[in-house]
Amino acid sequence: MSISSNMVKVAVVGGEGIGPEVTAQSRRILDWFAARRSLPMTLREAQYGLIPYLATGKVLPDDTVEAMDEADAILWGATGGPETKEVPPAARKAGSLLSLRSKYDLYANLRPIVASPALSDSSPLKAEVLKDVDFVIIRELTSGIYFGEPRGIEILPDGQRRGFNTEQYTTSQIRRVARSAFELARTRRNAVCSVDKANVLETSVLWREEVMALHREEFSDVELTHLYVDNAAMQIVREPRQFDVMVTGNIFGDILSDCAAMASGSLGMLPSASFGPVDRFGRRKALYEPVHGSAPDIAGKGIANPLGSILSVAMMLRLTLNRPDDADLLEEAVQTALAAGARTADIAGPGAKKLSTAEMGDAVLGALEMVAGRAREHA
């Protein structure tokens, strides 16, 4: 999923709610790697949301669109919150995250689920359940019920209102995301679990048939299993370590990844990466963002957990910048900071000191210096 260009262009879009706060800490991490590890990239900050709307009439102003169009990778913060009520629905829809996923065809969404030993007390799951949990959910991101037409709310002849949506998938939409899952599994523990609801949904019948056909034709060396989505949710809670790579449709992946977040201790810990198709130069547009939303209840208070965004930078280092050693370094620094007791409010136990968003950024930067120093000593 990496690109071959020597200089990578990154657009940094903080967005709304806590997005700018957590993204500011990720920007500090990127600046550290640029200065200390000669990271080959250029950064361009851009705005999204109510502020640019009030100035330009667009939640995605032209300069932000230009920055994202030119970027190899987009570091995204969050969208949504009370301020959305001040933006007309048509303007909000035109610049929505769903519209960006569609525009750039970001069809494969990767959400790593890793249980940190340091956070075993922060999860509602038992420590023995969390042991060795390390899997990835690949969610199809540009099709399914979130994009299907027709959709809407109508008035029936008897005066009742009816809401309706359309769930649909095609062979190519299923196969390309399944291919991403099989290819990723080959670099991990070589096992894919495909999740559907083929016992009641025709789209899931097609999903399972196409995943099985692709497996038979191109990936017979990879172990393939299938689960219905309700069973998958239960298995994620019962024994999450059984999974390596899980692939599923848009709405199922949306729900299951939030369920799986409890294995990491908090939704604020989860990173993600979304990829488009490979272009003629061998590059893939990528959008990196924390899984959490805009959290308007804590926006502006400086207490949000930036680790989901920071770990999204680690994914960027590995998957777009082709710097796996730097990605490992950053992930180790995060674990080092957590092991030393660094906690924001969402992962802090009773009586524990609660760091601000910026203080957690400080803790990770300090751990980076420590971990990088150890690496130099052993080089």
Map each language-model feature to its residues:
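Generic secondary-structure signature for well-ordered alpha-helical cores
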Residues: 31, 35-38, 70-73, 102-109, ...
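Buried hydrophobic positions in well-ordered alpha/beta secondary-structure cores of metabolic enzymes
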Residues: 16-19, 72, 138, 181, ...
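Glycine-rich phosphate/pyrophosphate-binding loop and the adjoining helix
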Residues: 142-143, 148-188, 192, 198-200, ...
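N-terminal beta-loop-helix "entrance" segment that forms/cooperates
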Residues: 36-62, 234-236
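Accessory "access/gating" subregions that flank catalytic or transport cores
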Residues: 199, 207-271, 368, 372
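Glycine-rich phosphate/diphosphate-binding loop of Rossmann-like nucleotide-binding domains
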Residues: 11-28, 32-34, 157-230, 239-242
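N-terminal glycine-rich phosphate/adenylate-binding segment common to multiple enzyme folds
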Residues: 54-164, 251-253
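Glycine-rich phosphate/nucleotide-binding loop
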Residues: 52, 237-342
